[in-house]
Amino acid sequence: MNMNESISKDGQGEEEQNNFSFGGKPGSYDSNSDSAQRKKSFSTTKPTEYNLPKEQPESTSKNLETKAKNILLPWRKKHNKDSETPHEDTEADANRRANVTSDVNPVSADTKSSSGPNATITTHGYSYVKTTTPAATSEQSKVKTSPPTSHEHSNIKASPTAHRHSKGDAGHPSIATTHNHSTSKAATSPVTHTHGHSSATTSPVTHTHGHASVKTTSPTNTHEHSKANTGPSATATTHGHINVKTTHPVSHGHSGSSTGPKSTAAAQDHSSTKTNPSVTHGHTSVKDNSSATKGYSNTDSNSDRDVIPGSFRGMTGTDVNPVDPSVYTSTGPKSNVSSGMNAVDPSVYTDTSSKSADRRKYSGNTATGPPQDTIKEIAQNVKMDESEQTGLKNDQVSGSDAIQQQTMEPEPKAAVGTSGFVSQQPSYHDSNKNIQHPEKNKVDNKNISERAAEKFNIERDDILESADDYQQKNIKSKTDSNWGPIEYSSSAGKNKNLQDVVIPSSMKEKFDSGTSGSQNMPKAGTELGHMKYNDNGRDNLQYVAGSQAGSQNTNNNIDMSPRHEAEWSGLSNDATTRNNVVSPAMKDEDMNEDSTKPHQYGLDYLDDVEDYHENDIDDYSNAKKNDLYSKKAYQGKPSDYNYEQREKIPGTFEPDTLSKSVQKQDEDPLSPRQTTNRAGMETARDESLGNYEYSNTSGNKKLSDLSKNKSGPTPTRSNFIDQIEPRRAKTTQDIASDAKDFTNNPETGTTGNVDTTGRMGAKSKTFSSNPFDDSKNTDTHLENANVAAFDNSRSGDTTYSKSGDAETAAYDNIKNADPTYAKSQDITGMTHDQEPSSEQKASYGSGGNSQNQEYSSDDNIDVNKNAKVLEEDAPGYKREVDLKNKRRTDLGGADASNAYAAEVGNFPSLIDPHVPTYGFKDTNTSSSQKPSEGTYPETTSYSIHNETTSQGRKVSVGSMGSGKSKHHHNHHRHSRQNSSKGSDYDYNNSTHSAEHTPRHHQYGSDEGEQDYHDDEQGEEQAGKQSFMGRVRKSISGGTFGFRSEI
């Protein structure tokens, strides 16, 4: 996959390069049968891919990869024969020639750099070169040591902004131009020529030449530089500056590399990087022959430039072959990685040491080894960064194909194109740049973002479905694959892929933007740098979008964050572009960040969408497609980003409202649903209930928040279950401070809201990395925390704690969404209200008594209790519990199911807040389960919870414990059927006295809960599951998360 990704990506770069590799010779690239064919195939695939990834995220990616393989591998092989390493595929189009030409690559690379790819490669090359200081030192040393190097570096590093601004004419080019002209032209140009990279330094020629890659090959170095200088190159340079600065190797590589700016541009520009790695690396590889590199620059530049239209391979293979085979090979890995995935480019930048070192390794290996080694190395490099790999793969699907589509549709892409997108689509972007850099880039961004969004959604679902290892603890993981929270939960690990899925596009774009910081970077430095941080401070989601875009998008290279800033600045400049690209970019970075801050971006965004509407996921895709999320989510427009990312992506919620609400956690309804829940709760709101209701409302906000952390439905349940401010606070913390998610997870566990933590953790676990932490915490606290902590969280009420246990059982049933367990769920959700029905009890025949039923439901509810009850309980119940547990396990795996059950358990209250799940669930419920004989034993179990309600708070969940509770449960159960939310809280209202509070409700609802469980059992079996589904849905405020969880 990595190699394929590389190939695919390379193919993308190649295609792009073929299409746009040289402003001067786009036709010749198109004429490349491989690139043209690939172009066709990719362009045909791209539009489909936009839509396809949703349906077949994996298969589409693989199809694209296969296409890329089929198209690129043969071509690569052919060119590998030309001593173009497979990595040259991307390079091969743009970079390969540049990279292959490696030091000629300045021209070749520049030519390609002229197209984004070269710049990107150059960056890689630079990183690589830097990394390959030994080989690179030869030339880099020259570059570095040489005045030109110093000068170039000086320019790049010293005045990246000036560079940008100077070159300002083309935005990206402006940077390169300023830098090149200033450094390259004046001081570096001569030295630059001396240097292989100096040629790049010769930005005077290069600058003009760079964009017109074909243009002045006379100063091959200049040409190369020119490419670097050229928009993408310039952008790359700017970014390269950032990268160079950030990545000393990059800087060094840039300076040293014939493309000081170009290299820088490459570093910045993924396009440039792609080529530049070849160039730089070629330099590195050729660095041994510094003169050779230079010669390559000149010779290859001229030859390659001429050849480039014909084919990168010819360029690479031929002119560069003597030195370039290794250079190519060296560049290959880099280029491949670089072009293969822009993420890698960032990696190269960020991981200049590691990635560069790897490349260095490859530089040495590749330099000496055959191009095939490059493929291996590329594969290794790709493998080196899983996220990078994903980036490659995703980029292929999202970015590469999108770019190819751009190649096919320069105008539409142009419309979307953003200067920032250059880095994302270095190959095609640079080409696009040549064709119509801004517009095309914009189009590319949009297409990529849309396609990335679609692909992201598909892959996200894919990942979410297979993200149980991320969701490890929750059954919800799979069921929640619909849920943004789960996705984000997965995003910690899986969503890295998702991030990478988008990252390549947005990353390329970002790097391009950052690299072509001339437009973006100046603003990026001022606006983007702080904008990103502003986003960070302003909104975690935005921060994720911004900082994470930089860091996360630079999943491979955190160094890219400055670049990202610049790019974002560029994106900011191009609202459309940024918005278009950002959704994938944000997603990618958020996904990547999800490992650290899963909620920062993706969680809020996805969860909001998914929390509130089953179609919200589609909304998310649509938002992405519609650039709702991408536009606003992207940092291009921080305010819009916050607003739409949260508002439009959620669909129902305003992102700002969501974020603020999440932070407030209960200040105002996050969404209509939250409002609805709130209204329902408020109906029965009393002091405690008010809090509880508030918590639930907050929980709905937590739906958004929990979306981040725990997904709306679960948060709703969680809130219902916890119905406690601590839980809400935790959710608020998690959501309000996405950055603090990890902290919050511990906090939740530490908060003493163990149950909140546990429940939330269970949900969290389902929904986000914070949930993971929570679920871990919950797992830790699960038994006791769920019961006691949960109780303690909301109400120090032991009843609440007991309710929590019942809740766990009920929730477990819900979670299991098993008809058998739906019993418990239904009992909790529907039957619970109907619990008073003796017939239900009888029909459940759990003991003919609600206590027996409750006992059964209780045991089902509490995982821990289940264990105890299994021992204590009759084999039939044990079997049922085992069944439920098994279902739970099947849903989320043993760990997830146990954690989920322990944390959330089968929370009837989640289904039906009225259910005394809160007070009901108790670790002691084993005894309560044990005393199937009567409510009293359950009361014993409820002793903690029932301490308050020794009366009817019998073991029976909702049957006899509190008659009004029981009746209310029936009443509420019906209400819940009609309006789950209103019923839930009305239920609390019904139990308006002490039971009015959610906790009391739980008490009163304990019996009702038992009946509810019984009812659920019977009803579930009798087809009441649908009602429970309705209840869950209504409780979750229409959130499908309940079902998904179940």
Curated annotation (Swiss-Prot):
What's the source species for this entry?
Saccharomyces cerevisiae (strain ATCC 204508 / S288c)
Q: Where is the composition biased (Basic and acidic residues)?
A: 81-96, 430-455, 529-538, 586-597, 621-630, 773-782, 868-890
Extent of Low complexity compositional bias? 952-963
Q: What is its main location?
A: cytoplasm
Alphabetical keyword list? Cell shape, Conjugation, Cytoplasm, Phosphoprotein
Q: Which domain of life is it from?
A: Eukaryota
Q: Where is the composition biased (Polar residues)?
A: 98-149, 175-191, 228-301, 327-341, 389-408, 420-429, 488-498, 548-559, 570-582, 742-756, 792-802, 837-855, 922-951
Repressor listed as a keyword: no
Q: What GO terms fall under cellular component here?
A: cytoplasm; mating projection; plasma membrane
Identify the stretch(es) annotated as Disordered. 1-455, 469-894, 908-1046
Q: Output compositional bias ranges, type Basic residues.
A: 964-976
Give the UniProt subcellular location, in the record's own words.
Answer: Cytoplasm
Its biological purpose is as follows: Polarity-determining protein which forms a conjugate with the ubiquitin-like modifier HUB1. Involved in bud site selection and cellular morphogenesis during conjugation. Required for survival during stationary phase.
User: What is this protein's record name?
Assistant: Protein HBT1
Record-listed Phosphoserine modification sites: S41, S303, S363, S491, S561, S671, S857, S1005, S1034
Residue(s) carrying Phosphotyrosine: Y855
Q: List the disulfide bonds.
A: none
Which residue windows does the record flag with biased composition (Acidic residues)? 605-619, 1006-1019
How does this protein assemble? Answer: Conjugated with HUB1. HUB1 has not the classical C-terminal Gly residue, so it is still unknown how conjugation may occur.
Q: Could you tell me the Gene Ontology terms of the biological process aspect for this record?
A: cell morphogenesis involved in conjugation with cellular fusion; regulation of cell shape
